[in-house]
Amino acid sequence: MARLPCGIYFETYDKERAYIRTKPQALFLVLFFIGLLVAPFLLSVRFVSMMNLTMITMICIVGLQITTGYAGQLNLGQSAFMGMGAFVASSLTVHFHLPFYLAIPAGGLGGGLMGIIFGIPAYRVKGFYLALTTIAAQIIFPILIMRMPASIFGGSMGFHLDPATFFGISLDNEFKLYYLVMPCTVLFVGFAFNLVRTRIGRAFIAIRDNDIVAEMMGISPLSYKTAAFFIGGSFAGVAGSLWALYIRYIAVDQFTLWYSVWYIGMIIVGGMGNILGAILGTVFIRSLEEIITTLGPYLSQHYPQIGGGAIWLAGMNIILGGTIVLFLIFEPKGLVHRWKILKASYRIWPFPYS
């Protein structure tokens, strides 16, 4: 009980705004980061692979949370921004032999610039019409890649990449790639947590709540809406660069509108307007996908009457879509709302939370 904070325990605003406000929080974070460092030594290759894919997706979803959850700009082109980052990084790696630690930021810049191009109309349109504008990114992206000379973006064949190397070490397996993906994820998620606490983050929230009032207060909607798309696109571009280095083959059919819709679904499940919500939503949906993928072949083998792989592919989409609908109906604030209730209950234990 001596370690449990209760009542009014913040004496200054700085303490209230601090990242780590209690000793249990500090202990949890230390154990969490130790767990991240030793995880590949304790887990199977398949589980490490799942963690790598989840963390790459997480970077993309955190960027989408900044654009949509904080700035209120509905973005259905995140997959295209991710694809642009992947193709830029791959082109620089294959044609110019740029090392991965330079190709990844370049991919982020490519995704961010594409975000600016399709984010500028956000100054004039919003809601449904803005969604249509960002869908245009998904339509234009594959046409652009296919029409450009194959010597630039690989054309219809895409790119085959060699394993990245770092000081002579080839990053050619899940274990080694984990120690590339994990630090990048920690860096960008940490940046996002800090960003939304700054003046820029508060401006995003003001524009989301009421852009007219925000403009009257001296906030430039054009500047901040464009910045939101640039930041979100940059996160997606970095995720795309990591994706390309991870699977070592990319093509335009890996970055379709379908994935952009699922990305929106992840922040709905996790909770809009909260970086932790993006993290929880990504982990939840990716874990659910893995469970369905694991159970599908087993059930098809033991119960052949239910159908084969195609049935389970359709079933996965139905289950994931149904999950999102259930969250919209029964938990519209997402998993992060449950987490906040859990924290509040912990702080006042043994008294009931109401």
PLM feature spans:
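Transmembrane alpha-helices and adjacent helix-loop boundaries
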Residues: 1-354
